[in-house]
UniProtKB/Swiss-Prot annotation:
The family this protein is said to belong to: In the N-terminal section; belongs to the zinc metallo-hydrolase group 3 family.
UniProt source species: Salmonella typhi
UniProt entry tagged with the keyword Iron: yes
Protein name: Anaerobic nitric oxide reductase flavorubredoxin
Principal subcellular localization: cytoplasm
């Protein structure tokens, strides 16, 4: 089924509600995606891009119901990746002599995927035009490394539509095609997620390329992307966001993520977050366990943040594998204008935190001091973590923070109070996780100093997600 975009332009793409992994398993498409292909019917009939290769047969069948394939005069391939040009082999088997307009780099990419050097390729470069009749032209603009060397955009005069390729798109599937028809919160979340995880490495190219396109002084009434919605309502809003995101973007936000074997590094993360909030209650702090979180959400939060704290247990003298993998991805994304600090617990020998700190520095982060704790952090160690958080809050503040005269209560007083007033520690009978009233459970809004009797009935064990009824008094404290 086609959808009218504007005048003689129709969407003939494919929705993919089920896809959950993109670029292998590197991008989680939690809201599906779409592969946008456009059919222009003027004096000349033009097809802009195809769809993902797994929908090749369906795409050609649907296209045949819209137009006699032999009547397609030109094919435009803005990008040779398989989710854009994947149906070319199926299509060209029907119309093998139809000219394909693309960049020189795209010929190499297309042949690399489809192995048909005999196809009728027509190389275009920035400023080249193609007359499609009725007083209208297609103008081509090369956009190398946004995000492949072969990438380009195509502008249609008369209708003032920019076919923008991957730029300004999002992996977002909806029955509606246009930006003003969908949930705006979801849409802009997916736009930022897409930019943070795919286009961030090329931020230095975004601003000059947008400036170059604006320099053509061409009106833009619509931006027709390769994935997600078509921008018809105030289409320049997404262009303005790209310019903002490309300019060393950061919010007053700190992201903390960690992996842990025995919950010790998690305790450190909670305490560090408490310290940050004590000194700067206005900064947004998000905590993620990488083993249980969507990594693309973590990376999007890193993109938004002024700084990141990364925690790892030590395993065989090195960091946890999921942490190592995520730091490697951050290295490839080449975040700019970000600060970082490493922390973690260890047993008889360390090594992971130092290695992690070096990796973060190699990834381009401005480093602050790291923090280590041996074994399970006691009250003294947790106070050091909170102090580390306070120090980080001051060092990373975007504006000077007021001095505080509040003094931290001596550890001995806290210990006495805990033993006398807060009741016993509780242990999950399933996974052995221990609830310490002195520490609380900040991720579930249970403040430090909360006795078990005051913990809400909807409390869930953070390790196994079972309720309060599976908890018993810790054996060493039972009377």
């Amino acid at each position: 089924m086609s959808i009218l975009v504007k005048n003689n332009i129709h969407w003939v793409g494919q929705r993919d509600w089920e896809v959950r992994d993109f670029h292998g398993t590197e991008y989680k498409t939690l809201r599906g995606s779409s592969y946008n292909s456009y059919l222009i019917r003027e004096e000349k009939n033009v097809l802009i891009d195809t769809v993902d290769h797994k929908f090749s047969r369906e795409f050609v069948q649907n296209l045949r119901s819209e137009i006699d394939l032999a009547d397609i005069d030109y094919i435009i391939i803005n990008h040779a990746e398989e989710d854009h040009a994947g149906a070319l082999t199926e299509l060209m088997a029907q119309i093998p002599d139809t000219p394909i307009y693309c960049t020189a780099n795209a010929i190499d990419s297309i042949n690399g995927h489809h192995h048909h050097p005999e196809w009728n390729f027509k190389v275009v470069k920035t400023g080249d035009t193609l007359d499609i009749g009725d007083g209208k032209q297609l103008i081509f603009v090369e956009t190398p490394m946004l995000h492949w060397p072969d990438s380009m955009m195509t502008y249609m005069t008369g209708d003032a539509v920019l076919f923008s390729n991957d730029a300004f798109g999002q992996h977002y599937c909806d029955e509606h095609l246009f930006n003003d028809e969908v949930d705006q919160t979801e849409l802009f979340e997916q736009c930022q997620r897409y930019y943070a995880n795919i286009l961030t490495p090329f931020s230095r190219l975004v601003t000059p390329k947008i400036t170059e396109i604006l320099g053509f002084n061409l009106p833009v009434d619509m931006i027709a992307t390769s994935h997600g919605v078509v921008w018809r309502d105030n289409p320049t809003q997404i262009v303005e966001l790209y310019l903002k995101w490309a300019a060393d973007y950061q919010e007053d936000r700190i992201t903390i993520f960690y992996d842990t074997m025995s919950n010790n590094t998690r305790m450190m993360a909670d305490a560090i977050a408490q310290g940050i909030n004590e000194v700067d209650p206005n900064v947004a702090v998000k905590i993620f366990n990488v083993a249980r979180s969507d990594k693309n959400e973590i990376l999007t939060n890193v993109f938004r943040s002024k700084g990141v704290l990364v925690g790892t247990s030590t395993m065989n003298n090195v960091m946890m594998p999921k942490i190592a993998g995520l730091v490697e991805e951050m290295t490839g994304l080449r975040f700019r204008n970000k600060r970082a600090s490493a922390f973690g617990s260890h047993g008889w020998s360390g090594g992971a935190v130092d290695r992690l700190s070096t990796r973060l520095q190699d990834a381009g982060f401005e480093m602050s001091l790291s923090l280590k704790a041996k074994w399970r952090p006691d009250l003294d160690a947790l106070e050091l973590c909170r102090q580390h958080g306070r120090d980080i809050a001051r060092q990373w503040a975007l504006a000077p923070l007021p001095e505080t005269t509040q003094k931290t209560a001596p550890v001995e007083e806290t210990t006495t109070c805990t033993a006398a007033d807060l009741g016993p520690k509780m242990q999950c009978s399933v996974c052995q996780w221990i609830y310490d009233p002195a520490l609380g459970e900040p991720l579930q809004d249970v403040a430090p100093g909360t006795p078990w009797s005051d913990v809400p009935d909807n409390f869930l064990c953070p390790e196994c997600s079972l309720g309060k009824d599976v908890f018993d008094v810790l054996a060493t404290e039972a009377k």
